[in-house]
Amino acid sequence: MITKQSSNESFDVIVVGGGHAGCEAALTSARLGLNTALFTLNLDRIAWQPCNPAVGGPAKSQLVHEVDALGGIIGKLADLTALQKRVLNASRGPAVRALRAQTDKRSYAHEMLKILQNTPNLKIREAMVTGLEIEHYPNQIDQKTPEIQERIGFIKGIKTYFGSVFHAKAVVLTTGTFLGGRIWIGNQSMSAGRAGEQASEGLTEELKKLGFTTDRLKTGTPARVDRRTIDLDSLDEQLSDASDKFFSFDPLSWKSGEQMSCHITRTTKETHQLIKNNLHLTPIYGGFIDSKGPRYCPSIEDKIVRFADKDSHQIFLEPEGRDTPEMYVQGFSTGLPENLQLELLRTLPGLQNCVMLRPAYAVEYDYIPATQLEATLETKRISGLYSAGQLNGTTGYEEAAAQGLVAGLNAARLVNNKEGIIFERESSYIGTMIDDLVTKDLKEPYRVLTSRSEYRLILRGDNADRRLTPLGYQLGLIDERRWNIFNAKQQLINQEKERLDKERIKESDKCAKEIFSSTGTPIKGSLTLANFLRRTNIHYKDLITYNLTTQSIPLDVEEAVEIDIKYSGYLERQKAQINQLKQQSKKLLPKNLNYNNIETLSKEAREKLTISQPKSLGHAAQVPGVSKADLTALLVWLKIEKMKKVKRKDSLQITN
């Protein structure tokens, strides 16, 4: 509709929602010079961590590094508020290693609010957004069929619950679990986006009127228990092992407070039996809701049903902050009634006398299947309307933050009449995630995983700055100070790699005998330091041990040099694969191609490609329902057709 009301205020970009996606979107837009407003239901819950107060983990830490490399904030705040840091998969290859930080959730939210309040061009407003102001294109007003993907109009602003109108040239929706949010404990439920906070009303209905398809998903969070009532001395202690590692590439953010321990307990036979006896009382198994939950973060009842052969599951007790006794019981989310939850907690070793401060609950909410979005995160139906975070069907603060940055960036570029930026899946986990979201028909909350990327050896966390900071600088997301820091680091890396390629160890050197004595591997003749570093059991720290370094260099430079040299062959092969893929994606497909005649394609791919008639192999890759196997089949078909043409041409020449 075209509003007849006067606008309370006008902005270039409005962001709806103050979670991790919304904060990144608003900050990105404002830092690009756009007059930006962030609307949130509750100013006291900005960037709240309603579930696990932690940042990072496999693939998630890579996302955080990438967001930081593009000027985002999540990595800096995770470093600033970290209670504990650990490197996961430390014994495995660099492609799957991950940094994870337990954070102080209240401090994290407080620091984010301070940043938002002190960012030029950014205003914050507390209000419930219930409607969108749209100007329809001529003859498009009644076109509300979800299957029709062409644009029907463009965004003009938003409307709040109490009737205020705010105009904007672009709007980013980052509503999290608040659209139609309903929390469940057993068979009891109430309208809420999360415990203690009201759900958002009206916006889902508005989106449906505009022709968007919406659906429902669910997630859950475990109980919080009082640290003072847990026998921590009887449990295994998990210490921090990475206080010297950071998410951010900015040295000004390299701060670590006193580290806190986590503790480990396990479920028991009593735990499992109590759950089995009461499955019918949970929202899912009792049939009260049927929304899909996150596959990779299952409830404890899901674990016991799905892994019936296991008689115990590991549970982590994690602090929520320095100034609170609350402990997060990781791996123990449940939908059981509140009166059974304390009994269940007390079956865990060390928690026999625990006090439950907050019960576990499940939350069900509306989302927009992301196939209705462009790869820029702009909606296909409404120009200037963007969507990011859990509203797109993802789960996790890291996934939300990355989408928020992309949506905020592209909303700002739209206002400035610039072309949107698409992150390719081979260039970043951000690109991998968005490509998956907008091209695949996902039916459960999406979590980024290293296994989702075909190029994970290249898309590591340690080189996110090398991959993305030049782009960030070009786009105006990285300032001169950060750019100078980046260039100085690259110079150090290159200089050290050149040195290691030139300098050699000789069999007669004193250190050669020390190396043989400690490793059992002799130095024969002479060997470049680079080739020495390529040995399986040798790391950069060994160069320091054997006095084979000329200067002290930062830890991040050491790691970059070691990975570049040790995995050079693999990296070159993967780069070649990416270049080949880029060339293949440019291959044109014939007009009006009858895909039903290509028997090697899946039935779904034939149907989807027949309708969409993509111009190239790259465009075919963007069609929902077309798999990698289908693309390979198309590539083979193109090669066969090319060979047939050559044969026909040769045959004609012989005939003539």
From Swiss-Prot:
Keywords: Cytoplasm, FAD, Flavoprotein, NAD, tRNA processing. InterPro entries: FAD/NAD-bd_sf, GIDA_C_N, MnmG, MnmG-rel, MnmG-rel_CS, MnmG_C, MnmG_C_subdom, MnmG_C_subdom_sf. It is found in: Cytoplasm. SUPFAM superfamilies: FAD/NAD(P)-binding domain. This is tRNA uridine 5-carboxymethylaminomethyl modification enzyme MnmG. PROSITE patterns: GIDA_1, GIDA_2. The keyword Iron-sulfur does not apply. NAD-binding protein involved in the addition of a carboxymethylaminomethyl (cmnm) group at the wobble position (U34) of certain tRNAs, forming tRNA-cmnm(5)s(2)U34. Coiled coil: none annotated. Belongs to the MnmG family. GO terms for cellular component: cytoplasm. NAD(+) binds at residues 293-307. The lineage of its organism: Bacteria, Bacillati, Cyanobacteriota, Cyanophyceae, Synechococcales. Signal peptide: none annotated. Pfam families: GIDA (PF01134), GIDA_C_1st (PF21680), SAM_GIDA_C (PF13932).
